[in-house]
């Protein structure tokens, strides 16, 4: 066994032991740990920024692009937001131990379901060190142990944050191994983590399509994931066009880089001439490049012809594909063929069309008269999220505290025996 395998095996064993202790942890102890972490992050700001400066300097020397450097940097504001996030998670209801679906059988046996932690969660993520705190806090609050493996470019930052997390756990009388940060940049550690089925119950990858595709191929541990966010807005024949203009504009321009950004606009032929000229001009003035089908380009004079690659692409930038369709069925067929199952929306005042769209579009979130950029756990009232899942099993859509738990059956009787 290699040194990396030995190291990861030890991490996994400690996490599994800690997960059993976390099953017994009280809500008060978990909240105490979270609040201690929030105080320590602010108190140790200088130490955190010194560690982060090493990562930023190395990343800049290696030519990391400006947007990624910005994500990597722990500014005063980002540190304050991490502390505030910890306090917000501490204030959320504890999902553990809640009882649902209670019934009494004819023989008097009481049957119910209890919400319990998943166990040990591995989180694999790229350059943003704030994910270390977000992931640790959500896993802790939901009663799970977690193993965190951040990007190599943020190693010093993540290790420093990990020390703060473990000090908070210790202060609350919880096992420090409930949150462990992998302190090696060796990629073999990731390969081992996603195959340790005896110690890890689920993996949550946070990163680009390349990372998630690779993990999906290599993992033996189940993944909660989404590959990409190729999101659509369909403007129906019965749409309020003022709403449609604002929804489509917001869905594209709110933030280009989020996974809920609209990448393709589908417009019913009956309203295309009235919607597209003004909307196209507004988008162009905002710096958005338009790529359309031949029919759409009639009303988008500066647009470029779209091809199949455009329908399939998650741009994560100021580019929008536009297609004119003749029916709601054609719109839903397009989404079924080219969509990623993330988030899709219809703009319509027709109730039956709205109901059909929500019933038949097979995505993790389906909206009526809302922009797709609402795909976010905070917007759903979840308080926080570990990510967005397009899986059909277990969690789907934004994954908050409840998504990091599962249900077990609990039965109570008075000595009944089965006949």
From Swiss-Prot:
Q: Where is it chiefly localized? A: cytoplasm
Disulfide bridge map = none
Its pathway is:
Amino-acid biosynthesis; L-proline biosynthesis; L-glutamate 5-semialdehyde from L-glutamate: step 2/2
* Keyword Oxidoreductase part of the UniProt annotation: yes
| One GO MF term attached to the UniProt entry | glutamate-5-semialdehyde dehydrogenase activity
Name of a matching Pfam family: Aldedh
Any GO BP annotation: L-proline biosynthetic process
- Alphabetical list of CDD domains matching this protein: ALDH_F18-19_ProA-GPR
Q: Transmembrane region positions?
A: none
InterPro entries listed in its UniProt record: Ald_DH/histidinol_DH (IPR016161), Ald_DH_C (IPR016163), Ald_DH_N (IPR016162), Aldehyde_DH_dom (IPR015590), G-glutamylP_reductase_CS (IPR020593), Glu-5-SA_DH (IPR012134), GPR_dom (IPR000965)
Where is this gene product found? Answer: Cytoplasm
Any one Gene Ontology cellular component term annotated for this protein? cytoplasm
E.C. number: 1.2.1.41
Out of the domains of life, which is the source? Answer: Bacteria
Instruction: Write down the chemical reaction(s) this protein catalyses.
Output: L-glutamate 5-semialdehyde + phosphate + NADP(+) = L-glutamyl 5-phosphate + NADPH + H(+)
Name the UniProt key words of this record, in alphabetical order. Amino-acid biosynthesis, Cytoplasm, NADP, Oxidoreductase, Proline biosynthesis
Q: Does the keyword RNA-binding apply?
A: no
By sequence similarity, the record places it as follows: Belongs to the gamma-glutamyl phosphate reductase family.
What function does this protein fulfil? Answer: Catalyzes the NADPH-dependent reduction of L-glutamate 5-phosphate into L-glutamate 5-semialdehyde and phosphate. The product spontaneously undergoes cyclization to form 1-pyrroline-5-carboxylate.
User: What is the protein named?
Assistant: Gamma-glutamyl phosphate reductase
């Amino acid at each position: 066994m290699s040194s990396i395998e030995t190291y990861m095996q030890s991490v996994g064993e400690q996490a599994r032991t800690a997960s059993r202790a976390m099953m017994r942890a009280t809500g008060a102890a978990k909240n105490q740990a979270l609040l201690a972490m929030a105080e320590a992050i602010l108190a140790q700001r200088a130490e955190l920024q010194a560690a982060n400066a090493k990562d930023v300097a190395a990343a800049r020397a290696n030519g990391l692009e400006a947007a990624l450097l910005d994500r990597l940097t722990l500014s005063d504001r980002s540190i304050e937001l991490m502390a505030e996030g910890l306090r917000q998670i501490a204030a959320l209801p504890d999902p553990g131990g809640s009882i649902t679906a209670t019934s009494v059988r004819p023989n008097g046996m009481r049957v119910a379901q209890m919400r319990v932690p998943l166990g040990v969660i591995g989180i694999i993520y790229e350059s943003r060190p704030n994910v270390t705190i977000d992931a640790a806090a959500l896993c802790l609050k939901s009663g799970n142990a977690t193993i965190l493996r951040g990007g190599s470019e943020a190693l010093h930052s993540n290790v420093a944050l990990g020390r703060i997390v473990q000090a908070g756990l210790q202060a609350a009388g919880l096992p420090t191994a409930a949150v462990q940060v992998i302190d090696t940049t060796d990629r073999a550690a990731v390969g081992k983590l996603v195959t340790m089925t005896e110690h890890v119950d689920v993996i949550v990858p946070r990163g680009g399509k390349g990372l998630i595709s690779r993990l999906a191929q290599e993992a033996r541990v189940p993944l909660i994931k989404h590959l990409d966010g190729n999101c659509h807005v369909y403007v129906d024949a019965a749409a309020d066009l003022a709403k449609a203009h604002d929804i489509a504009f917001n869905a594209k321009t709110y933030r280009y880089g989020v996974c809920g950004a609209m990448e393709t606009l589908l417009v019913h032929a009956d309203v295309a001439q009235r919607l597209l000229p003004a909307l196209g001009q507004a988008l162009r003035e905002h710096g958005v490049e338009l790529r359309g089908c031949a029919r759409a380009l009639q009303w988008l004079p500066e647009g470029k012809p779209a091809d199949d690659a455009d329908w399939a692409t998650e741009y994560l930038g100021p580019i929008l594909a536009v297609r004119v369709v003749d029916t709601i069925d054609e719109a839903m067929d397009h989404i079924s063929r080219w969509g990623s199952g993330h988030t899709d929306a219809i703009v319509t005042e027709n109730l039956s069309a709205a109901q059909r769209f929500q019933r038949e579009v097979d995505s993790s979130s389906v909206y009526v008269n809302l922009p797709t950029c609402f795909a976010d756990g905070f917007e759903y009232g979840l308080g926080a999220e570990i990510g967005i899942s397009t899986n059909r099993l277990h969690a789907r859509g934004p994954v908050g505290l409840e998504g990091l738990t599962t249900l077990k059956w609990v039965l109570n009787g008075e000595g009944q025996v089965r006949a």
